[in-house]
């Protein structure tokens, strides 16, 4: 009888334990669902003009509704935000203050419609950032591959109404949640899987950009000048920023991996991203990538390996660039279509060979690095040799480009010229007029501004020419011009706190684990967006900005996680 009671008590205990576990599993599933849905919508947007369509809301409004609906449900769900770090709440509060000021600007705005649009856009970014920041469940690579691939395919071949696209992406998120979500994994592993998933749409952006040059008759370039690659985003400068962010993520991620196959694939992605970045001819994007690369080398560990990875990719990359110099129609708007098609086919053949070489070099290097280890003296000598070689290569490349620019370094980039002349031009073009008009408007209304999203009307009233423009091409000045001092300070505080917090955490981490390098890659990618936004209007292409906020939230979570215990780190590395 006593045995029966004991068995009954044990059964009852298991039942109570299962009941206690069920809410945890449901919460983990909902968190994974939320993150997958946000990422799926972002990937779809990166494939469809960045969710931007001039004057039409249907491209990004459904995504905004989904993100805000998920945020509303998350707020009502107990325990959803319990793992958000203190620093994360500070960042959320600063973004919320920015959204609040933009909403209040409805009282004094000169255009209610534009203010509503901008407030809704900013609220969507806040929602995506908060949701990503709260998610502490892991989705392995297979789950990310499922969701990202389906989103890319739907964007490429969609013929059904937009709402069905979102429903199908939600289905993908549900599948990924039920099949792959895990909670009891280290933060580094969760973030690594997220980075792997986000590199897939970057590969799609790079691939489509290359197709625009390989098959120009089938994949037309939609940019204004008809020869700068805009890829699926349609705007070359924003495409360059996404590619630069992806290249830094690929470089940092491949350095943390040991699998030769994965490292070879990342080498192909890195080469493709850098080549497409060059074909955008975006000075701001390329220089922002350079700044981010410097941040990565300053904060990251394994610098010698990163230099080796870059050198291995630069071997086929330099050969490919040399071959492209004889394909003049690639970067010429006036070239006949027949010449463009012929040069595109030549580029295709060279590109296939370069990708094979990049994959093979990285795979062989990864195999050798896993079997042999250099001594400290050899590392030091190789580091010095690599640094000197990189400096010489940079100096020679700079001299070649400047020599080919014809001395037009300070010319207006809008005046045309060759690709080399455009890349070395320091002029800011019409942006000087945009900034002057915006600054004068801010001085007239320093506390309130003219209303969120209303710069186009300020420009129409004060423009010195007949040229039309909607954005001020400076995200920071735009906050002050449109919504006054308080919005400017809120956004500036968000940027400074985000970069300082994550960079400090990366610098203080142990160099022996993969967490420092992974966090440094995220910080570098975030810096690329923030630096480029000083001369561009990426904020108004929701998909690119959602991509940024997902990375920013991942960096904040990883920064707060800190180093794992030494024994756990050793076990994870050994496994």
Model-identified regions with their sequence ranges:
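Membrane-interface segments at transmembrane-helix junctions in multi-pass inner-membrane proteins
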Residues: 218-249, 253, 332-354, 475-479
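Hydrophobic transmembrane alpha-helices and their immediate junctions
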Residues: 265, 485-520
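Membrane-interface alpha helices of multi-pass inner-membrane proteins
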Residues: 150-155, 268-281, 528-534
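Aromatic-rich transmembrane-lumenal/periplasmic boundary elements in polytopic membrane proteins
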Residues: 208-219, 395-444, 448
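Transmembrane-embedded, aromatic-rich helix segments that form part
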Residues: 241-242, 285-295, 488-493
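Transmembrane signal-anchor hairpin modules in multi-pass inner-membrane enzymes, especially those
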Residues: 1-104, 110-117, 127-199, 253-267, ...
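Membrane helix-loop boundary segments at the extracytoplasmic
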Residues: 43-53, 480-483, 517-549
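TM-adjacent membrane-interface loops and short helices in multi-pass inner/ER membrane proteins
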Residues: 235, 417-470, 476-479, 483-490
